[in-house]
Amino acid sequence: MASTARIPSVPAAPAAPAAPAGPIPGGGLGRRERARGALLGLAVGDALGAPAENMKPSEIRARWGRITGYVTDHPAGTDDTEYAIFSGLLLARHGSALTPVHVETAWHEWIADRAEGPFRGAGFSERGTLENLRRGLAAPISAQHRHAWSDGLAMRAAPHGVFAAGRPDEAARLAAIDGSVSHDGEGIYGGQAVAAGVA
């Protein structure tokens, strides 16, 4: 920004306000840096937690003690990161114009109709969805399975919040559209809460 001190017709800018007493949300980082941090944090957290997934705290302590870093030489994420990438790709392709048809088409194109591919892993809600899609059921019927309540949408909802930064209602709306193929009820609400929180 150019200085206005040399231009007589523009009044001098008022003194900067005192720094706030508490921390600034986002730490003064720009939107791109916060988005990158949110998505990298998701992936790193997933890789850190993956070896201990589904273990009881007592089992974790017995095996590793207190975990303060990676516990394997080759950390890798899970389907949580893969499906967050899936949601991010949907947003990159469709943005706020995202519809359930777009989501369902992507499930077929990138996951259900392939024997192998980048979205290899799947939680139980995704497996139920894949089974329904492969049987020819369309959204929202594809989301009617025993695990539609699960956290699968919540695990992939961060990109919606990143995309709709500062607009939690829009982030929640997009998460509900994404989840309409795979989740229902509490499964949708959990994803909306994560997306809105990230936004």
Regions picked out by a protein language model, each given a short descriptive name:
Residues M1-A199:
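Structured, active/binding-site neighborhoods that engage oxygen-rich ligands
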